[in-house]
Amino acid sequence: FVTESHYAVNIVDELQYDSIYHEHLRFYLLKPLDVLMKMYGFKIIDAVRIPNYGGSIRVVASLNQDIKPSKNVKKLFNLEKSKGFYTSKKYKKFSSEIAKNKIKLIKLLSNIKKKNKSIVGIGCPGRCITLLAYCKINSKILDYIAEQNTSLKLNLYTPNTHLQVLDEKYFFKNQ
């Protein structure tokens, strides 16, 4: 059995809080995956970090309990433990860093706006909406969001923050 999932180590260590939204509610560590696999008679025999989606983990499990796990399995267990991922302290720090990041981003954007500069968002994926909503970035800060001309989001508005999504041609024309 092979599964690939967002890896919590990347999400937390790289402050990728914007990737947590309705389509991405699961972020795994190897230890909880091991518990899950054991519940169904599987044994993790390999695990590797892969770059997909900002950092994922590919886990190989087998019903054959005689297969010896690769060195990668122990290496990742040790990495997660050494980084404190099995403690609440790690997640409290993550929460604190997210709040600091929000303040830093708002200050940066506000300073640019005070200079009467335009600020345009480029692209409107799901994680964009998470960032906009959490940081309360609206049309007072961002002028609009530019999106590819094939997007179904064109001429619509972002939820909650009400930013208009315009064809990127408008952005290139008005630089």
Report each predicted region and the residues it spans.
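Short beta-strand segments
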Residues: 2-4, 46-48, 58-62, 120-122
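Short, glycine-/aromatic-enriched active-site segment of Class I SAM-dependent methyltransferases
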Residues: 3-26, 30-33, 37
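Short, solvent-exposed loop/turn segments at secondary-structure junctions
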Residues: 7-10, 52, 66, 125-129, ...
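Short aromatic-enriched loop/helix-cap "lid" or pocket-rim segments at secondary-structure transitions
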Residues: 12-16, 59, 157-158
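Conserved S-adenosyl-L-methionine
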Residues: 42-53
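Flexible, glycine-/basic-rich loop-and-beta segments that form/coincide
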Residues: 53-101
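A short, well-structured juxtamembrane/interface segment
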Residues: 97-115
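A solvent-exposed beta-alpha-beta segment
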Residues: 110-175
